[in-house]
Swiss-Prot record:
Protein name: Protein Pcal_0062
Database matches in NCBIfam families: molyb_syn (TIGR00177), PRK01215.1 (NF002291)
Family designation: Belongs to the CinA family.
SMART domains: MoCF_biosynth (SM00852)
Coiled coil: none
Species of the source: Pyrobaculum calidifontis (strain DSM 21063 / JCM 11548 / VA1)
């Protein structure tokens, strides 16, 4: 299964001012597309940290997606830091410049040095149109790897991903289908369910099972258990998940007669 890294850039994420919804949204999308998300990294608006994050991600993952830092303000430096990570001099991409110019002209704003910066990217990069904002995304391919830089504004990031990135990843990725089931278990502590989950995964190696406590471990145990799998066909993915779910319920009921499962 091809691997993916997600890099989210912004001081606001690290001080708790903004919740990192972009990472969760992208991780879900990538998982359903058949990519194994191996890291989600949050870095500040600091060049050396962004450079380091890109270099590590490109060394280890097949797909790297970043969000944030593509705008006109002084701390928007992700595109420039990415160039440095590649060892490339940033250039003004004429196609991207046209996109930015037209966006601002339609609102009656002139081009400025700060706005031109939004069109800067490494040579050979492809700008991705932003249908709801001003900063283009950036697509760069090297050595069989795909790197995508997206804006940090969620609706802009989502629009570019769904319009341009998702179709590309579908065409390049494996024929993968994702299936998931969620079951709730009341009355059994998570620690007691853990060996059952381990046994279910041993018997069903294509399936991942994860428990999420929603109540109090001792006084009022309540668990949500997620079961999911990826496979080349929907039938295989659903069959694997259904088999694991059946075994999970069977083992819990056989060991804990007081368990409520729904």
């Amino acid at each position: 299964m091809p691997t993916a890294y997600i890099i989210t850039v912004g001081n606001e994420l690290l001080i708790g001012r903004v919740v990192n919804t972009n990472a969760a949204w992208l991780a879900s999308k990538l998982t359903y597309l058949g990519y194994s998300v191996r890291r989600i990294v949050v870095v500040p608006d600091v060049e050396e940290d962004i450079v380091e994050a890109f270099r590590e991600a490109m060394a280890k993952a097949d797909v790297v997606i970043s969000t944030g830092g593509l705008g006109p303000t002084p701390d928007d430096i992700t595109n420039l830091a990415f160039c440095k990570a590649l060892g490339a001099e940033p250039v003004v991409n004429e196609e991207a410049l046209k996109m930015v110019r037209e966006k601002y002209a339609s609102r009656g704003y002139p081009m400025t040095e700060e706005r031109v910066k939004m069109a800067m990217m490494p040579p050979g990069a492809v700008p991705l149109p932003n249908p709801v904002g001003t900063a283009p995304g950036i697509l760069y391919e090297t050595g069989g790897k795909i790197v995508v830089l997206l804006p940090g504004v969620p609706r802009e990031m989502e629009a570019i991903f769904e319009g341009y990135v998702e179709p590309l990843l579908k065409s390049r990725g494996p024929p993968a289908h994702f299936s998931e089931r969620v079951v709730t278990v009341r009355g059994v502590p998570e620690a007691d369910v853990a060996p059952i989950i381990r046994e279910v995964m041993r018997q069903n190696p294509r399936v991942y099972v994860k428990s999420h406590p929603k109540g109090l471990e001792v006084d009022a145990p309540l668990l949500q258990i997620h079961i999911y799998a990826s496979a080349p066909t929907p039938q295989e993915a659903e069959g694997a998940v259904d088999a694991a779910l059946k075994k999970l319920v069977e083992l819990i009921k056989s060991k804990f007669s007081n368990a409520a499962i729904y």
